[in-house]
Swiss-Prot record:
Sequence ranges of Polar residues compositional bias: 225-236
Subcellular location as annotated: Cytoplasm, Cytosol
Binding-site list for a divalent metal cation: 573, 575, 577
Residue ranges, annotated region (Disordered): 216-248
Summary of the function given for this chain in its UniProt record: Dual specificity cAMP and cGMP phosphodiesterase with marked preference for cyclic AMP, which is activated by cAMP and cGMP. Likely functions as a cAMP-stimulated cAMP-phosphodiesterase which may play a role in regulating the cAMP relay response.
Enzyme class name: hydrolase
Gene Ontology biological-process annotations: adenylate cyclase-activating G protein-coupled cAMP receptor signaling pathway; adenylate cyclase-activating G protein-coupled receptor signaling pathway; cAMP-mediated signaling; cGMP-mediated signaling; protein localization to cell cortex; regulation of positive chemotaxis to cAMP by DIF-1
Known cofactor(s): Mn(2+); Mg(2+); Zn(2+)
Domain observations: The beta lactamase-like domain catalyzes the hydrolysis of cGMP.
Record lineage: Eukaryota, Amoebozoa, Evosea, Eumycetozoa, Dictyostelia
Species of origin: Dictyostelium discoideum
PROSITE patterns registered for this protein in UniProt: CNMP_BINDING_3 (PS50042)
Recorded GO CC terms: cAMP-dependent protein kinase complex; cytosol
Co-factor note (free text): Divalent metal cation. Can use Mn(2+) or, to a lower extent, Mg(2+) or Zn(2+). Half-maximal activation occurs between 10 and 100 uM of Mn(2+) whereas maximal activation occurs with 10 mM of Zn(2+) or Mg(2+).
Name of the protein: cAMP/cGMP-dependent 3',5'-cAMP/cGMP phosphodiesterase B
Gene: pdeE
Length: 1096
């Protein structure tokens, strides 16, 4: 037998020795004392998983990061490792090493660790798996297989004496029996069987080895005894807070920093050595604003991150096609399935809907008015029918092994090409440079090894290369391989966020009629702080947003404007610079209302379905579509809207509205050219009526919002300057850069709330508008949701509207709670702890009501952190509604900006409802102590995926419609098959979701997790329909749950939030089961391929 391979096996046991010794020396987890190494040699059972969990936990906690595992978390992490990693290990005979490696890395990454630690862990883990794979294949081919296995499991006296301090003879007897059993199982290849033992130990051992140099500086300070904690003056709660702060401070994305650069949002750029061509992973909407030179893009694991598309390739394509005149094509690297989805998106954007998806015949109600959108497209672009998608873009798809090979030009020698292999393993993207060159080098090295098998130095070269058995991957050390985890769903941060060029608005009141421009530029404008065209039309204090730009939601929320203030959307067409921001609005909080034609809505639905991967029915639950027609006017927020199709390359609607004898119009993207219209009329392409409406539809208004751009897709500025002067001065030109020359005759509006243009209406309409605004606030307020219409009317007449100046006190803690408030505009800060500023400087402010002036005083220069921030639509002073009690305020409330409030005095409400006071109190009652105790759990439950910011009023509504239910340790909450009549949020404790029928654990839930989502279906089905539970839920610890009955929450908006969360939970569970190892289809075990040059 070749002694070199015997030495390699001894080295393996030495590594194992080193690993166990390090645990013995450094580990401080009390639970690990019960670890029994011998139990890992037996078949899978309860003891095996328990010890495996402790084993992995010890490695992770001791060597990856520091200060992030608490003693209380040991059991939880152990259970999770049993559930995920343990079950994956059960399927090792059907898994490749690389798949196992990804599973391990995912578990480590979820727990935490620094970037350098995780990258190093990946490198050494792959190194070991590849190396041991070759060793196992060598064993399998050997004629002396039995002898080699016996040598592997030899007693301790046959090995180096240094291992004697780790194992005793009984340990090696067990190991010997284990390997003997391997050889008796039909002489099966040890490839899969040995990997059970090796991967249990060695994959994470390499993580330990990679961090050995820094181990002395990474000592754990967890699991100190109570005596030690007392001595250090640190309580367990303080320690948890410190650990949480550490995690937040040190949380980093997972990528190779030496070769990969993080750029805007969750996207990254890789530049190969000796190459000027970069490759970007992730394509957020503002990619071109950062860099116009990149034309190679890798689509990440998820096409969207949070609420933003990471596959926004439309404008890189348009830039290369129209600005660069087709010098280069965009290269998209993705999976086959992603290619199909992206093709759908691009076809809708570039070519528009197919003929069978155009419904103008049923959308137009005007007699003798015909619009042939396909013919008009050809009139604008005569080559439209000849171009195919491949004239814009090149797709390169990963093969069945997750591999793409590309050649890039060398920077030092343009005549040569650089070989690059890109590998996608379940979202882990790795770049392997000079793959083909190295493959040849490896072949030569293996031949050299075959000539001199006795030369041990050949196995320890510093420039070591490895190839796996299927020949799909080369791993080179010395930073030749770079990796990026594309499964990270980090928060999108635009390159140029809204508000970057102006301060946060200190005072904003939505006007009766006006326009706020969120963006006035286009997708190919790369100048500072340019945003794509979109705007809000304010009507009676509420907003209709037109083509919302990306980032608008964050900007509005920063200034205290949330979904219910702007929950109506008009979509003009399906180009990325007009529809990208709608996704943010759809999932912001409320179920928004979308106004557009059937043709455009179905086109957008096809794009959205391809982007999200969700079925159409699920997407329809996130917004309500209101079809608009050409010829029939519709009412939105009291204004009368009229729509028509513009003259554009894909179906696009324009509109005008009228209210209070004032008109606003919008052209949308269009080509306005009188000479072209005349030419097309002479050719019989456009009818006389069509031309008349194209010439006059938008110009009959008090404010004309008109686009401008490059012909023939857009309207040249010169054409607008030819309009009569009385029209030009009413135009607000958009969709153009700041460099456009308007000759001083046409206004290019400014962006931002502070630049809102107000259209003055007759004084007689102001009272009507104010009544509508108050009534809207009452309708949205969940506190009054149980009142009858007559009672709401009585409440309406009792309110007063007041203004509070910035920094003034609205409510002082400890003062009588005798007023209830609804915020109409502005933001306030709530301080539950005593509000005591450091300095004693005082300022005096005033609160002006319709009839009174109230003087207030507040100390300035405070540094106290507010408990909560509140904005428009939210409520204050709820304790004042307990009309049968006199209660003091529990918090101080300060105006962060100028604030407009609706106010009800307790005394007025008592007087108005004195005859049925108890009935009124029961309808508006809110259990404030219960609500406060529930707040954290509810915010955790609803802040992910469904809504980024669930506000106080919504939290209060959900909490007020819930009740606490308690369960003891191991008590069943509900069983599979039980009637599903309620949903739950975990307020305290933990819950195990499992299937008694299938005898498996589905997942573990913690504080803030939401479950029991099948109950929401009751509100959508026949009253006789009773859904049943699909799993069993059991309390692991003493647990308190918030029980939600959908019938107890009558506000439709709050019901929608809960139902969206329930549907998202159901979709997540489907995905979870789809990737669960329990139901994964087993694959055929891998064939063992011989490695040339290795023999015994």
């Amino acid at each position: 037998m070749n002694s070199k391979y015997g030495d390699n096996i001894i080295d393996f046991l030495r590594y194992l020795e080193k690993f166990v010794k390090s645990l013995t020396k450094d580990n401080k987890i009390e639970e690990f004392k019960t670890f029994d190494i011998k139990s890992l040699l037996y078949p899978r059972n309860k003891d095996y998983f328990g010890n495996l969990s402790k084993f992995l936990l010890a490695v992770i906690s001791a060597r990856i990061g520091s200060n992030f595992i608490n003693e209380d978390d040991i059991f939880e992490i152990s259970e999770l490792l049993k559930e995920f990693l343990g079950q994956e290990l059960e399927h090792l005979p059907y898994l490749s090493y690389e798949e196992l490696y990804v599973e391990i890395v995912e578990q480590v990454g979820e727990i935490n660790g620094t970037v350098s630690e995780i990258i190093e862990a990946i490198t050494v883990t792959i190194d070991f798996l590849d190396t041991f794979e070759k060793v196992s294949q060598t064993i399998d081919r050997s004629n002396e297989k039995q002898k080699l296995l016996a040598y592997l499991s030899a007693p301790v006296n046959q090995l180096d004496n240094s291992v004697s301090g780790v194992f005793n003879e009984n340990d090696y007897t067990d190991i010997q029996r284990f390997f003997t059993e391997l050889t008796n199982e039909n002489n099966q290849s040890p490839d899969s069987n040995i990997s059970i033992l090796i991967n249990d130990f060695q994959s994470l051992l390499n993580i330990l080895e990679s961090q050995q140099a820094s181990s002395s500086s990474s000592k754990m300070i967890i699991n100190d005894s109570p005596r030690t904690q007392q001595r250090n003056g640190t309580t367990e709660q303080q320690k948890k807070q410190q650990q949480q702060q550490y995690l937040q401070k040190n949380k980093e994305p997972f990528y190779s920093k030496d070769k990969i650069m993080q750029v805007s949002g969750p996207s990254y750029v890789f530049t190969p050595s000796d190459c000027n061509v970069s490759i970007q992973v992730g394509i957020p909407p503002d990619t071109l604003k950062r860099d116009q030179s990149i034309c190679h893009f890798i689509v990440p694991h998820f096409l969207i991150s949070k609420d933003v598309s990471l596959s926004e390739v439309e404008f890189p394509i348009f830039y290369n096609k129209f600005v660069q005149k087709g010098k280069t094509k965009v290269v998209i690297i993705c999976t086959v399935e992603q290619k199909q989805r992206i093709e759908t998106i691009l076809c809708e954007s570039i070519f528009g809907p197919a003929p069978e998806h155009i419904y103008t015949d049923e959308e137009i109600t005007i007699p003798d008015y015909k619009i042939d959108l396909l013919t008009e497209r050809l009139a604008i672009d005569p080559r439209a029918n000849d171009e195919k998608l491949d004239s814009y873009v090149i797709f390169k798809t990963f093969d069945t092994f997750g591999v793409v090979d590309i050649d890039l030009p060398s920077a030092s020698d343009p005549t040569k090409l650089i070989n690059l292999r890109i590998r996608n393993t379940k979202g882990l993207i790795s770049f392997h440079e000079d793959y083909h060159v190295v493959q040849k080098q490896l072949h030569l090295k293996l031949q050299e090894q075959q000539q001199d098998q006795q030369d041990k130095s050949s196995s320890s070269t510093t420039d070591k290369q490895m190839i796996n058995t299927s020949g799909n991957r080369i791993i080179l050390k010395n930073n030749t391989v770079s990796v990026i985890d594309s499964t990270i769903e980090s928060q999108y941060v635009p390159v140029l966020p809204f508000g970057n060029d102006h301060e946060q608005v200190k005072k904003f009141k939505a006007p009766i009629l006006g326009v706020t421009f969120l963006g006035v530029s286009h997708g190919l404008d790369f100048t500072h702080c340019s945003h794509t065209t979109g705007f809000i039309i304010w009507i009676n204090g509420s907003g209709v947003v037109v083509d919302p730009p990306v980032g608008n939601t964050t900007y509005l929320q920063t200034n205290g404007i949330y979904g219910k203030t702007v929950e109506h959307i008009i979509l003009t067409h399906c180009h990325a610079d007009h529809d990208s921001g709608i996704l943010q609005k759809i999932i912001e909080r409320n179920k928004v209302t979308l106004y557009t034609t059937k043709t455009i809505n179905e086109s957008y639905m096809r794009k959205l379905k391809a982007l999200t991967g969700l079925p159409e029915q699920s997407l329809k639950n996130y917004y309500t579509w209101v079809p608009v027609t050409i010829g029939n006017k519709i009412k939105i927020l009291g204004a009368e809207f009229e729509f028509d199709y513009s003259f554009h390359v894909i179906p696009t609607i324009r509109f005008k509205l009228e209210i209070y004898n004032k008109k606003i119009s919008y052209s949308a993207d269009t080509f306005y050219d009188l000479q072209k219209f005349k030419q097309l009329k002479d050719q019989g392409v456009l009818s006389k009526k069509r031309i008349e409406r194209l010439k006059s539809f938008v110009f009959d208004a008090d404010m004309i919002i008109h686009e401008s751009g490059v012909a023939p897709i857009h309207t040249p500025m010169a054409n607008l300057l030819e309009l009569p002067s009385e029209i030009r001065k009413k135009i607000r030109v958009v969709h153009c850069s700041s460099s456009v020359d308007t000759k001083g005759e046409i206004i290019r509006p400014k962006e931002g709330l502070e630049n809102t243009e107000i259209i003055k209406v007759d004084r007689k309409y102001k009272g009507v508008a104010e009544c509508i605004q108050i009534q809207t606030a009452l309708n949205h307020c969940s506190v009054f949701s149980k009142l009858s219409p007559a009672e709401v009317q009585r409440v309406f007449f009792l309110c007063k509207k007041i203004w509070v100046k910035r920094n003034d006190v609205i409510i002082k803690k400890g003062s009588p709670s005798d007023m209830f408030y609804i915020i109409l505009s502005g933001k306030v800060l709530v301080y539950e702890n005593e509000y005591e500023p450091i300095k004693s400087t005082t300022s005096v402010g005033t609160v002006v009501t319709d009839t009174t002036t109230i003087t207030t005083t507040v100390k300035t220069d405070a540094i106290k952190i507010p408990t909560i921030k509140l904005c428009a639509g939210e409520t204050l002073g709820e304790s004042a509604l307990q009309l049968d009690k006199n209660i003091d305020a529990s918090a101080t409330v300060i105006a962060e900006t100028d604030v407009c409030l609706l106010v009800w005095k307790t005394m007025d409400l008592r007087t108005e409802f004195h005859s049925n006071l108890n009935t009124f109190i029961s309808k508006v009652h809110m259990d404030l102590s219960h609500i406060n105790s529930c707040r954290d759990a509810i915010i955790r439950a609803f802040q992910h995926n469904i809504t980024q910011h669930i506000n106080k009023e919504e939290v209060d509504s959900i909490a007020n419609g819930s009740k606490d239910v308690s369960f003891a340790h191991h008590q069943v909450i509900f069983n599979e098959g039980d009637t599903s009549d309620s949903m739950y949020i975990i307020k305290q404790g933990r819950v195990r979701i499992h299937s008694k029928k299938n005898k498996n654990i589905i997942r573990y839930l913690n504080v803030g997790d939401f479950f029991g989502e099948t109950a929401y279906r009751r509100s959508n089905e026949d009253s006789n329909f009773l859904p049943t539970r699909s799993f069993t839920a059991t309390a692991i610890d003493p647990t308190i749950l918030l029980k939600l009955d959908i019938e107890s929450i009558v506000n439709p908006r709050i019901q929608n939030i809960i139902e969206q969360k329930a549907k998202k939970n159901a979709e997540d569970n489907i995905r979870y089961h789809a990737y669960s190892p329990k139901i994964r289809t087993p694959r055929t075990p891998r064939k063992v391929y011989p490695i040339e040059g290795l023999s015994i």
